[in-house]
Amino acid sequence: MAAPSGGVNCEEFAEFQELLKVMRTIDDRIVHELNTTVPTASFAGKIDASQTCKQLYESLMEAHASRDRVIKNCIAQTSSVVKQLREEREKNLDDLTLLKQLRKEQTKLKWMQSELNVEEVVNDRSWKVFNERCRIHFKPPKNE
């Protein structure tokens, strides 16, 4: 699933996380998808497993790339805000509101960066399941 066309709201971490949750649906349902679309040996002749695996591969690649873009875009945006707040803070060391805002943005940035680790785990799990069921039906291109 691609990111919504209206853009991503990186300002609210809860909205950012909810978007990722929705975007991870394909990974959450991969076992069910494979069980219902890729035949076992006894039903091998009734469904084109290579085409099904190819389509699932392409969907996974698109979903993973899309989420990676969203996460990295939000990290870049939040990093920019943190940098700006740091510069303002250096000019006005007595402003406690500014300090509080800086800390809040730094925390949000750390959470967003941790989503990259979550993404790696989610992707690894999906590829493991995909390869277990599709390796005999479909060979992904070597360049990816």
Curated annotation (Swiss-Prot):
The modification N-acetylalanine is found at residue 2. The modification N6-acetyllysine is found at residue 100. It comes from the Eukaryota. Keywords: Acetylation, Coiled coil. Signal peptide: none annotated. GO terms for cellular component: mitochondrial intermembrane space; mitochondrion. Residues 82-120 form a coiled coil. Belongs to the MIX23 family. This is Protein MIX23. The lineage of its organism: Eukaryota, Metazoa, Chordata, Craniata, Vertebrata.
